[in-house]
């Protein structure tokens, strides 16, 4: 009887320890500023700031982007459930979009996959992988873009300002 109680206690202790050791998913919340010196393959003159609000499996991103072609505000919300959802792409005007967002394995970051179509034909696919540095002060967004003209990769690194 004592050995069963001891064994049960040991199993519970091991279970509790494994739960405490499980990796925590990062929070991307904060204000972020683009760091051009640590980024590559982005539009000339790119400047970007972002405010991210991350609660559970929902990420809301509000960005202000400046390039040589002008300025724009981008507001997007991602639900990290791995389910496909419709969204309205900025360009071309008659485009439709499908988006899927999910956690990376072990909660190391998030993956956002967009497909843009015109008249039912896919014209671009973009995958974005968001990861945080161990100290939570650097956000890296790796872009993988395939469109009708070319395929390329870019990286945007952001420093936390708040």
Model feature map: region roles:
Residues 9-18:
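Bacterial N-terminal signal peptides
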Residues 21-162:
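Hydrophobic small-molecule pocket/channel-lining residues, especially in calycin-type beta-barrels
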Residues 1-10:
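Bacterial N-terminal signal peptides that target proteins for export
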């Amino acid at each position: 009887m004592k050995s069963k109680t001891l064994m049960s206690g040991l199993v519970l202790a091991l279970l509790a320890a494994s739960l405490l050791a499980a990796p925590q998913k990062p929070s991307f919340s904060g204000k972020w500023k683009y760091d051009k010196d640590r980024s590559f393959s982005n539009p000339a003159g790119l400047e970007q700031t972002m405010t991210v609000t991350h609660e559970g499996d929902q990420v809301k991103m509000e960005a202000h982007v400046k390039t040589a072609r002008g300025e724009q505000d981008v507001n997007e919300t991602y639900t990290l459930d791995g389910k496909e959802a419709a969204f309205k792409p900025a360009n071309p005007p008659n485009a439709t979009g499908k988006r899927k967002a999910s956690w990376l394995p072990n909660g190391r970051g998030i993956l956002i996959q967009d497909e843009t179509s015109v008249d039912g034909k896919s014209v671009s696919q973009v995958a974005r992988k968001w990861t945080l540095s161990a100290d939570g002060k650097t956000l890296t967004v790796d872009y993988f873009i395939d469109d009708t003209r070319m395929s390329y990769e870019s990286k945007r690194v952001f420093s936390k300002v708040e």
